[in-house]
Amino acid sequence: MRRIFILNLFFLISFMHFNSAFSISPDVFIQSTVNRASQVLSENITREEKINQLKIIAKETVDIKGVGFYSLGAARKALNDQQKYTYSNLFENYFLKSFSSRLAEYTNPEIEVKDKQILNSNYTIVNSVLIATNERPEVKIDWRVYTKNPDNP
């Protein structure tokens, strides 16, 4: 189960992206996103409300379509436009449900951004750690952030 969670987390973080209109660096973007999710999870609201708010955060920050097509691999080339459209919609629904319901189980997760490595003008790896608690071990998380406009990060 832990392996599946880490694999899903890898796919999520591998395709994080942000709009250049934010004009913030990738590490600040990640910390901001993490803080938003943590705030939702620590609120005294129903699980359903947490799930709905986490879905909004995911839609704003994750390239869900990119994750879906990456998951298809070479099979993507065999699909026609209608099949790609249908798949994208189904994958988005699956991703949002899986991501938000799994994350909603956490209460006040603390993720600390440690470092960043600029790979090129468009990609940055942001290193962070999910702080250990009595219930879960420390988990290292590397986020691959895509900057659409390197001149205005």
Which ranges hold each PLM region?
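Boundary at the C-terminal end of the N-terminal hydrophobic targeting segment
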Residues: 21-23
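Positively charged n-region of N-terminal signal peptides that target proteins for export
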Residues: 1-4
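Short beta-strand edge/turn micro-motifs at domain boundaries
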Residues: 138-153
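Early exported N-terminus immediately downstream of N-terminal targeting peptides
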Residues: 25-103
